């Protein structure tokens, strides 16, 4: 009994020591309750420093930032299974921080976490998507391609948010993206950023510097196939790859019997990025022996992806697309993007493609039109230069002819003078004049063209002068006609006004029944003189200021006229005439109102 207890304690001490060496002391300390460590715990630092050779300094360990080491020791949940490891070098959260509570069964963990193959596939899709965007911008124009490349680098460097990237990309290309682009970037961009951060830390640079130096690994079409999703990791050190220690060897005999049923699941928990992490130097197993040389990375990645997909998703049948991607030869990876794009274009996308092509054709037509205009301007400038050159050549020729027509003696003396170089210059100029310049039209054709142009100008000026004179004549005639009409209208208006005034005056003078104030029909008579007639008392009062001066005088004149009339009737033999022949002393305002008064007073 004592020996059994001693053997048990010896075994437990060995297990605890082994766990301390391997950094999994939590697993040994608490086998029955749920326990997990954060990726940036000191245990990770210890394990990383122990597993990394002395030639490669470990990446900086900051408690605030997440760990990006290629190997993160994962703890056990009830000692049954590992939490999924990093995707392409980016650690995934342990089981204690997953979406739901961890369970003791491996199937629940498979449902909660994403398989490494799926993560590698999504990362490859993201790289292929960014490369396609950059190529699409280059197809439009080099300037737009440069802008798209800057936007992609800013998105990966986290200097641009996904929404800003989406809006600026649409503004640069004038081409709307699909609706699933923003969710796709939000879901898969952190994988690429963690991978970039990991590679930058290994290279002792910040992500912006590393991406600026290794930009071709992100935007090169040859590195965006699914099997080459971790080419960014391969660029740091091609011969310094190490393998994460096998989980069965790492945890030893402490595995519970539940996992003995599926031993093939052990390699599937290691992502392709962890198998070939970019660490310098050789890697060592927990027993201190170096790992054997691994086979080519692509072969391992394909096997890992296929096995992980088969065992983790065994409850669902693989889709036709997955089988096609898995069984496609590696030589056809360059044409995979074109085939997928050709087969996945919808009617709306075809309409957008045609719209884009129409826009490109319109741009080409505009460029052709601008080029044609530029050539026309250049041709006109060349013609103007030729005309000016011919003009000066003709003037110089005329001047030379005049000089030649001068004195022959002076020319003879100049020819005999050895100092004067004029004959040589004249010969050179004569040779220049008679030698036709290459590309220039003969002078006769230019003269005819000038004469034709001048004739056209003269005809145009003549026609213009005729048109101007005709327009002036028509305008003058129109002004004269309108002026005559206006004068006739004014004269007619004046004549009509004069006739109306005379008619009114004559009507007032001829009417004996009209009012002396307003000219209407009179109904009353002035009681003072019985001569003035008014239409009413109002008009009589209005006219009294004028009428009272003559009202009494008229009455006195009538009384004085009555007295001689009576005396003449007594002495009929006197020489005085009849009272009808004697004019009154004072005449009324008008002769018409005085007539009835005379008629009325005569019988008296």
From Swiss-Prot:
Annotated effect of mutating residue 136 to A: Abolishes interaction with corepressor
Zinc finger (MYND-type): 515-551
Effect of residue 177 to A: Abolishes interaction with corepressor
GO CC terms in record: nuclear matrix; nucleoplasm; nucleus
Biased composition range(s): Pro residues: 289-298
The keyword RNA-binding is assigned to this record: no
Result when mutating residue 126 to A: Loss of interaction with TCF12
Domain TAFH: 120-215
Nervy homology region 2 (NHR2): annotated segments: 337-383
Metal-binding found in the keyword field: yes
Positions of modified residues (Phosphoserine): 41, 417
Biased composition (Polar residues): 63-86, 271-285, 557-576
SUPFAM superfamilies listed in its UniProt record: HIT/MYND zinc finger-like, TAFH domain-like
Keyword entries, A-Z: Chromosomal rearrangement, DNA-binding, Metal-binding, Nucleus, Phosphoprotein, Proto-oncogene, Repressor, Transcription, Transcription regulation, Zinc, Zinc-finger
Disorder: A chromosomal aberration involving RUNX1T1 is frequently found in acute myeloid leukemia with maturation (AML-M2). Translocation t(8;21)(q22;q22) with RUNX1/AML1 that results in the production of AML1-MTG8/ETO fusion protein.
Function: Transcriptional corepressor which facilitates transcriptional repression via its association with DNA-binding transcription factors and recruitment of other corepressors and histone-modifying enzymes. Can repress the expression of MMP7 in a ZBTB33-dependent manner. Can repress transactivation mediated by TCF12. Acts as a negative regulator of adipogenesis. The AML1-MTG8/ETO fusion protein frequently found in leukemic cells is involved in leukemogenesis and contributes to hematopoietic stem/progenitor cell self-renewal.
Protein name per its UniProtKB record: Protein CBFA2T1
Protein's organism: Homo sapiens
